[in-house]
Amino acid sequence: MARLVNCIKLGREAEGLDFPPYPGALGKRIWEEVSKQAWADWMKQQTMLVNENRLNLADARARQYLARQMEKHFFGDGADAVQGYVPPTPPGA
């Protein structure tokens, strides 16, 4: 049976992650309070941040920036908007 969490991002109960996705206290908090769906949404946001800002993940400053954005995304006022990103128009719109 899937582990359920009260997802802080979705505002409802949803399937939880299988393991903490990040080390330390932040990873434990994400594991306890974030659903698989919300984590997948963050992974898409993180990918856009890396690509649009041309972040080099070998650079410690880039990794620290992403960690701050992840914390803001889940537990703060939201991650930085991706500059230049225009969401796709839904079909028939």
UniProtKB/Swiss-Prot annotation:
- What top-level branch of life does the organism fall under? Bacteria
Keywords, comma-separated and alphabetical: Iron
Task: Cite a single Pfam family from the UniProt record.
Answer: Iron_traffic
Q: Does the keyword Iron apply?
A: yes
Query: A GO term (biological process) for this protein?
Result: cellular response to oxidative stress
Cite a GO CC annotation.
Answer: cytosol
Q: Which SUPFAM superfamilies match?
A: YggX-like
Q: Name one GO molecular function term.
A: iron ion binding
Q: Which InterPro entries match?
A: Fe_traffick_prot_YggX, Fe_traffick_prot_YggX_sf
Keyword Iron among UniProt keywords: yes
Spell out the HAMAP family in the cross-references: Fe_traffic_YggX
Please give the family membership noted in the entry: Belongs to the Fe(2+)-trafficking protein family.
Protein's job: Could be a mediator in iron transactions between iron acquisition and iron-requiring processes, such as synthesis and/or repair of Fe-S clusters in biosynthetic enzymes.
* Name under which the protein is recorded: Probable Fe(2+)-trafficking protein
Organism name: Polaromonas naphthalenivorans (strain CJ2)
Q: What is the lineage of its organism?
A: Bacteria, Pseudomonadati, Pseudomonadota, Betaproteobacteria, Burkholderiales
